[in-house]
Curated annotation (Swiss-Prot):
Family: Belongs to the IspG family.
EC number: 1.17.7.1
Domain of life: Bacteria
Matching InterPro entries: Dihydropteroate_synth-like_sf, IspG_bac, IspG_bac-typ, NO2/SO3_Rdtase_4Fe4S_sf
A single MF term (Gene Ontology): 4 iron, 4 sulfur cluster binding
Source organism of this protein record: Gloeothece citriformis (strain PCC 7424) (Cyanothece sp. (strain PCC 7424))
Entry protein name: 4-hydroxy-3-methylbut-2-en-1-yl diphosphate synthase (ferredoxin)
Enzyme class, first EC level, given as a word: oxidoreductase
GO BP annotation list: isopentenyl diphosphate biosynthetic process, methylerythritol 4-phosphate pathway; terpenoid biosynthetic process
Keyword Phosphoprotein: no
Pathway the protein acts in: Isoprenoid biosynthesis; isopentenyl diphosphate biosynthesis via DXP pathway; isopentenyl diphosphate from 1-deoxy-D-xylulose 5-phosphate: step 5/6
Residues binding [4Fe-4S] cluster: C315, C318, C349, E356
Reactions this protein catalyses: (2E)-4-hydroxy-3-methylbut-2-enyl diphosphate + 2 oxidized [2Fe-2S]-[ferredoxin] + H2O = 2-C-methyl-D-erythritol 2,4-cyclic diphosphate + 2 reduced [2Fe-2S]-[ferredoxin] + H(+)
Role this protein plays: Converts 2C-methyl-D-erythritol 2,4-cyclodiphosphate (ME-2,4cPP) into 1-hydroxy-2-methyl-2-(E)-butenyl 4-diphosphate.
């Protein structure tokens, strides 16, 4: 689904009042046949919720996601048995469908699991707070610098084999920090803060860099949007200071479900994307994973970062509206939603209609009772009876050679 053949090159300095989003320059990191960062389109990903030991169920779930536009699919790997199951999943996926970029999610004391699963996936996600898990001590009041360094060295020794394995195979790692699972020593040193999240990520980045491994993607997720925003912004600031250009994976973890879950995810992900921050996104909903993908693409389209569907412009309706706007918009959407790359405006009256739809490819405007005016761009093409409006709009699109059958 990745649509850009060559990376974009910024042509001007961003302005506060620029209507174009200027994305932060990052290095490209390959995950299978998809590139995260490097000027490529923001990548959409999700995670299956099947047990990885269920080979057929996992293959079917991965395929369902990929077929609707999920470009990278993550699977959970809580044990060695799950890690080995990935070999069968990948083999069956290729045999019955095609290769799909896969990510393994590894958590508690997962070094051996990560080494095994690295053979079968394109990227391994580790959680710095859990990869080398130190059981909290109830009587602890501080971490001395010596203790801090000793655990840091243990982390290095544990992480090194995985880094070298991924480096040898030219695969990727996501250093995925979660606000809710920071290591105890980070909590004691920095508190339950965005600073602790950023320092947790930087510790692992430095280990990777010391081993000359740079195929790294970073995430700093939280269930509270303000914490998530602060963590990513601080991460960008620190990386800029240190000369790092790693791509960022955006997400609000545990966003919930329904309308609020979507709004919460959009508030976090959309805000950062609008600032030029972010190279891949995952909307985490307490729903079927397939429900996450349209939300991702809608966020990207609303910001002008990727255009994968029709952009509908429609007024909210008022006393001047000359037809049932909600009903007509529904009819227009149902007739044209399979198209891509078009802007279609449905406006209720002549007062704001032509001006508000000036950037649209096609316009459907109520000018007098019982009749619809159809526009191509700013040009009025014809006036037709209201009951023929949708059909004639389709005919106009067809006449321009921009129609495809659903």
């Amino acid at each position: 689904m990745q649509t850009l053949d060559t990376p974009l090159t910024p042509t001007s300095t961003p302005s506060l009042f620029d209507t174009t989003i200027h994305r932060r320059k990052t290095r490209g990191v390959k995950v299978g046949d998809i590139t995260i960062g490097g000027g490529y389109p923001v990548v959409v990903q999700s995670m299956i919720n099947e047990d990885t030991l269920d080979i057929d169920g996992s293959v079917a779930a991965i395929r369902r996601l990929h077929e609707i536009g999920c470009e990278i699919v993550r699977v959970t790997v809580p044990s060695m048995a799950h890690a080995k199951a990935l070999a069968e999943i990948k083999e069956k996926l290729i045999k019955t469908y095609k290769a799909v970029p896969l990510v393994a999610d590894v958590h508690h004391n997962g070094m051996k699991i990560a080494l095994e699963v690295a053979k079968h996936v394109d990227k391994v996600r580790i959680n710095p707070g859990l990869y080398v898990f130190e059981k909290p001590r109830a009587d602890r009041t501080e971490y001395t610098p010596t203790e801090f360094e000793e655990i840091g060295e243990k982390i290095r020794e544990t992480l090194k084999p995985l880094v070298l394995t991924l480096k040898e195979q030219d695969k990727a790692m996501r250093i995925g920090v979660n606000h809710g699972s920071l290591a105890e020593r980070m909590l004691f040193t920095y508190g339950d803060t965005p600073e602790g999240m950023v320092e947790s990520a930087l510790e692992f980045i430095r280990i990777c860099e010391s081993l000359e491994f740079y195929n790294i993607v970073i995430s700093l997720k939280a269930s509270r949007v303000p914490v998530m925003l602060a963590a990513y912004r601080l991460m960008v600031k620190r990386m800029d200071e240190l000369g790092m250009d790693y791509p960022l994976h955006l997400g609000v973890t545990e966003a919930g479900d329904g309308e609020y879950g979507r709004i919460k995810s959009t508030a976090g992900i959309g805000t950062l994307l609008a600032e030029g921050i972010g190279d891949t996104i995952r909307v985490s909903l307490t729903e079927a994973p397939e429900k996450e993908i349209p939300v991702c693409y809608s966020i990207l389209q609303a910001l002008g970062l990727r255009k994968t569907m029709v952009e509908y412009v429609a007024c909210p309706s008022c006393g001047r509206t000359l037809f049932n706007l909600e009903e007509v918009l529904h009819k227009v959407r149902e007739a044209t939603k399979h198209l891509t790359g078009l802007d279609i405006a449905v406006m209720g009256c002549i007062v704001n209609g032509p001006g508000e739809m000036a950037d649209a490819d096609y316009g459907y405007v109520g000018k007098q009772a019982g009749y619809i005016s159809l526009y191509r761009g700013r040009e009025e093409i014809k006036k037709v009876p209201e009951d023929q409006g949708v059909e004639e709009l389709i005919n106009l699109i067809k006449a321009d050679g921009r129609w495809v059958d659903p």
